[in-house]
Amino acid sequence: MPTPRVSPTLLALALAAAFPVQHAAAQATAPEAKKDVSQLEAVIVTGSRRAENLKEVPLSISAIKSEELDTYNASGQDIRALSGKVPSLNIESDFGRTFPRFYVRGLGNTDFDLNASQPVGLVYDDVVQESVALKGFPVFDMAQVELLRGPQGTLFGRNSPAGVMKFDSAKPGKRFEGYANLGYGRWNSVNLETAVNVPLSSDWSMRVAGIVQRQDNRVHNPLPNATSDLEGYNDKALRVQALYKTAGFEGLFKVQARDYKGTATTFRANIIKRGTNDLVDGYSDSYYPTDGYNSQTLKSSEVSARLRWDFDGMSLYSITAFDRAKFYSRGDVDGGFGSRFGGIKDGPDYPGQKALIPFDAQTADGIPYLRQSTQEFRLQSSTADALQWILGVYYFNEKLQVDSFNYDSFATGDPQNGYAVQHQNAKSWATFGNIKYAVTPDLKVTAGLRYTDDKKDFDAVRTWTPGKAPNVDIVGPFFAKPKSTNWSWDLGANYALDKATSLFARVATGYRAPSIQGRVLFGDSISIANSEKALSVEAGFKADLLDNTARITGTVFSYRVKDLQLTAGSGSTNQNRLVNAAKAEGQGFEIDAQAIIARDWRTTLGFSYNDTKIKDPNLFVQPCGNAGFQFLQAGTGCNVLNAPGPLPGTVSINGNPLPRAPKVVWNWTLKYSTEIGDGELTVLTDWAYKDKYNMFLYEATEYKAKAALEGGLRVGYGWAAGKYEVAAYSRNITNHRQVIAAIDFNNLTGIVNEPRSYGVQFKANF
């Protein structure tokens, strides 16, 4: 499908017409009413490692403010609540509240191994969070969240050929102040977020913030000798920051930690109706018969120091961080009970669809040891001269162990009966530079260059083959030492048509280091994906309209990724393998708009179109393994839509869209505020839409997620000049239910989206 061609001028006029009609009419008939209508605040972003007005940055950036985060987090949701809230962003997880996977413009990674890498970088308070155990840190007491689309390979330290999610927490200040935000909702969920800022002296200030999120179990398992209740969690996080500031020096010191206990994602056997992507008849959220155990724990911590020395015309930055984590997740991957191969009755059955569990699959994966250390030194100009520059060096070191376990579901206590282990030591260093030059007051050009050197030292071994005696049938050890170097660059230009409107263009390259898939618990080999390289071209506009009561940004883009790293399943084995596609291409556009449409009404609209395609006629994969069990039960398995590959049991994926990459994503909010009595009533509704997408590399009727529209509603009343507020909220207010992910090696096992939640909030500021 060709990408629609729409000019920036037409887009600006269309959005302006759609949003501020009432305001424009009021201006024409009553100019004096103009002073009664507030204006949109300027958006300041730091994606260029400088604090700049959004209109002056030649990047496609969306910013999410702290007020919006309060709304999305109301019901205790985790980082996945940001999915679809800005254009071209998708976030999902097969592990629940941990191990989120990010996709920008369709580029992401579906790998569920705990050593997986991702093409979307996550930067939390200027520190790269590389491991999957670090990426899901709770989002609380934030100043701002930014999504930087497209390759960010010159200024940010690790794999980011698709983009960067940048989280910036609120920093210590000079006033004694704070807040407490308490929410209570369905399933006895509690969401408590609090922060206090304390000035300690003329030079020192401190900010302490924390969050507690908990929920009772909402899913019951009626079978004995297994986990009885699931989907509950207890998630706690704390952040302590101390800021020291004198003339010529600033030091920001941070300690943060997370402690999570709960259950992993509930995999539900045979809930996809064969021949469709519908839920089976008789599906129930609260009913989950399984013969396995389910638990999940995560502890992580970070100590960091961000230092700045100011000199004549320049500043030196040092960012030092040490991260560590321990993670464990166990679940019943087959999603049901019994085993046809074992002669044990299997299920559950649903009306019109008999269950099939060929074999049990109860596994666990853990990270008993993770140590990440990073260091960045950055020297950059601090003048108002036409030429601005940045020079820096970066170092990354990660030491990681990944354990994989298998369990016997049919022995008393479900004892362990399999084990494999991976070790990895990853090191990377880079030098980088960036310049920004004002050719004229209206035309500014930027250029960046980065050299990166990556090395990994990896080993994996299976010391206990499932179903056999330990240390008898040892497989491995396997060793790998991939390494690569890369030059990344970008060129950009920003031209101000006037004070309200700017045009920008950017060409950029991105790079992801080689990846290793060493999940050898069910396989006898490891796989290595070569480094991937992306080239992206984009252009757009940013405009403030109608006396700064409306704002719109628009971007058109096209990218190509060579040697794209993909994760392929292994048929009827609970195993992944890494492959490189010769090429993948994507193109589309994004629109981000906000407007004050009347004195008491505000609205936002985000829209993105992403057309992605794998281009490799020689690439083929094994599709759903459950289709191979026809001898156990006729008509089982999925209906594959791709053409057969060159080998029996394979299909070609040439021309397929990238997995988990919806073509259309849009979001819309409408906010009404009015004074009542001595306070203010606020009503806010927000809606997010995702188009259909393939769950895997291949296409199958059952494994194509439906398009989804989910909405939220919040009604609040604040008084005492905003010091106090009470509110009621609901998320997924239509209770839309559908399969959003699946397990394809055993049966038609699915993962379902979160059901409707609701509750009340009370917030106090001081």
Name these PLM-found stretches:
Residues 100, 117-119, 131, 140-149, ...:
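Outer-membrane beta-barrel translocator/receptor signature
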Residues 39-175, 539:
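Acidic, small-polar-rich N-terminal luminal/periplasmic segments of exported/outer-membrane proteins
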Residues 243-245, 379-382, 394-396, 422-559, ...:
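Structural signature of Gram-negative outer-membrane beta-barrels, strongest in the C-terminal barrel
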Residues 390, 445, 558-560, 580-697, ...:
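Gram-negative outer-membrane beta-barrel transporters
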Residues 227, 231-389, 396-398, 551-553:
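Outer-membrane beta-barrel domain signature, strongest for Gram-negative TonB-dependent receptors
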Residues 687-697, 717-766:
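C-terminal beta-signal and adjacent terminal beta-strands/loops
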